[in-house]
C-alpha cells in the first residue's frame, strides 16, 4: 500500500522554500499521525501539563507551536537533504528508516520522563509565558525522538507536508495532555499508550523494511 502511494506521487522537487504551492496531503497526514503517536507519553506532554498550571493554555500552546515549528523545520531540512542526496538509493533509505522506527518503538517502551532539572525549570518558569514555554520546548526537543522521527519521515516524504504535519501532530498531542490533565486531573493511561505507540512504530518500521527489500 505504501509503495503504491510512493510510486504514484510526482517526482521529488528540490528543497526550495515556497516551491510547493500546497502541502502534500499524504505527507501531512502520515507525519501528523506518526508524530502524534511519538509524542504520546513523551516528557513533552508532562512539560505541557506543568506549564499549563502556571500560564494560560493559549500561551502554552503558542509557545509549543513556535518551538516545534523551528525544530521540525531544521529536521525536515536534514531529512530532505539526505533523501535528495541519496535519491538513487531509496530502497536502502527505506530500510534504514524502517530500522530507525523499530528503534523508536524500543525507545517508547523504555519510557521518557522529565528529569528533575526539567521539571523544576517548568515549575519555576517566569517572565513572558510564550517565550518561557518556547525556549523550554525548543531545548527539550533537540535530539528527542520526535525530532529524529521527523528527520526519518522527511527522507521519504515531501518536506512541506512533513513539516506542517509533524508540527500539528505534536501540538495536538500536547493539547490532548493538557485537556486530560485539566478535566480528569490525571495523566493519560501510560501503560496503554506506551505499548500501543510502540506497536504502531514497529509495524510502520517493518512495512518500510519490507518495501526496501521489495517484498511488496
Regions found by a protein language model. Give the residues of each.
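Residue-level signature of transmembrane alpha-helical entry/exit and packing/kink sites
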Residues: 26-30, 60, 94-97, 125-133, ...
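Short, Lys/Arg-enriched N-terminal segments with co-localized hydrophobic residues
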Residues: 4-24
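Hydrophobic alpha-helical transmembrane segments in multi-pass integral membrane proteins
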Residues: 137-145, 203-216
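Juxtamembrane transmembrane-helix termini in multi-pass membrane transport proteins
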Residues: 22-87, 149-171
Amino acid at each position: 500500500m505504501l509503495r503504491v502511494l510512493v510510486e504514484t506521487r510526482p517526482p521529488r522537487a528540490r528543497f526550495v522554500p515556497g516551491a510547493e504551492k500546497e502541502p502534500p496531503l499524504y505527507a501531512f497526514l502520515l507525519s501528523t499521525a506518526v508524530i502524534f503517536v511519538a509524542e504520546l507519553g513523551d516528557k513533552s506532554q508532562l512539560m505541557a501539563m506543568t506549564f499549563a498550571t502556571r500560564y494560560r493554555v493559549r500561551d502554552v500552546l503558542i509557545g509549543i507551536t513556535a518551538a516545534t515549528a523551528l525544530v521540525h523545520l531544521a529536521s525536515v531540512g536534514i531529512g530532505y537533504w539526505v533523501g535528495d542526496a541519496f535519491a538513487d538509493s531509496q530502497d536502502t533509505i527505506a530500510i534504514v528508516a524502517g530500522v530507525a522506527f523499530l528503534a523508536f518503538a524500543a525507545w517508547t517502551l523504555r519510557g521518557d520522563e522529565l528529569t528533575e532539572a526539567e521539571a523544576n525549570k517548568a515549575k519555576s518558569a517566569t517572565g513572558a509565558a510564550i517565550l518561557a514555554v518556547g525556549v523550554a520546548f525548543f531545548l527539550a526537543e533537540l535530539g528527542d525522538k520526535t525530532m529524529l522521527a521527523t528527520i526519518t519521515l522527511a527522507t521519504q516524504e515531501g518536506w512541506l507536508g512533513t513539516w506542517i504535519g509533524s508540527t500539528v501532530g505534536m501540538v495536538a498531542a500536547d493539547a490532548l495532555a493538557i485537556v486530560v490533565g485539566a478535566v480528569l486531573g490525571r495523566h493519560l493511561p501510560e501503560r496503554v499508550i506506551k505499548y500501543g505507540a510502540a506497536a504502531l512504530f514497529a509495524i510502520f518500521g517493518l512495512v518500510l523494511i519490507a518495501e526496501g527489500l521489495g517484498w511488496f
